From Swiss-Prot:
Protein family membership: Belongs to the RRF family.
Protein's recorded name: Ribosome-recycling factor
Record has Lipid biosynthesis as a keyword: no
UniProt keyword annotations, A-Z: Cytoplasm, Protein biosynthesis
Localization annotation: Cytoplasm
Gene: frr
HAMAP family to which the protein is assigned, alphabetical: RRF
Length: 181
């Protein structure tokens, strides 16, 4: 019984952490190295995250500087950023790749919030699926009485509500960050 709750709680916590990591990559109009976490470069034939092949710094609030450890990767980094859905325009020279982060228009901000809320719903569905699977597991276990199953359902629902509330709170903070000028 406790095992079912512990597994559900861990899976829900993992989902909340995954959401936190996911929204770090959403552009806010300020330069952030985490923006490039999902950008992959072809490093000797292997897709590798940019942050594992280069030093990424933010010398100014609207500027990202990427300094690949292997200078031959500069064009690969530029190509990978151009292919990404970040809508950034990298400029390269012999040593580094510079990316000026343009200020977000209100229309783009609203679109980003809309996109974030759509993705948020997918994470909420994950939480609900964990709830459903955990309750099904408890019901299928013949060694657990009906009263105990009802108690497990109540506890799992509390975990579900708490996890969804956390997702919403994280999203509200990001939305404020996105809508701030």
């Amino acid at each position: 019984m406790d095992e079912i709750l512990l597994i559900a709680e861990q899976q829900m916590e993992d989902t909340v952490v995954a959401w936190q990591e996911h929204i770090k990559t959403i552009r806010t109009g300020r330069a952030s190295a985490t923006m490039l976490d999902k950008v992959m470069v072809n490093y000797y034939g292997t897709p590798t995250p940019v942050n594992q092949t280069a030093q990424i710094s933010t010398p100014e609030p609207q500027l990202l500087v990427i300094k690949p450890w292997d200078k031959t990767l500069i064009q690969e980094v530029v190509a990978a950023i151009n292919k990404s859905d970040l809508n950034l325009n990298p400029v390269s020279d012999a040593e580094v790749v510079r990316i000026n982060i343009p200020a977000l228009t209100e229309e783009i901000r609203k679109d980003l919030v809309k996109k974030m809320n759509k993705e948020l719903e997918n994470f909420k569905v994950r939480i609900r699926n964990i709830r459903r699977d955990s309750i099904d597991t408890a019901k299928k276990d013949k060694s657990i009485s009906e009263d105990v199953v009802k108690g497990i359902e109540t506890d799992i629902q509390k975990l579900t509500d708490s996890s969804i509330k956390q997702l919403d709170e994280i999203s509200k903070v990001k939305e404020k960050e996105l809508m701030a000028i």
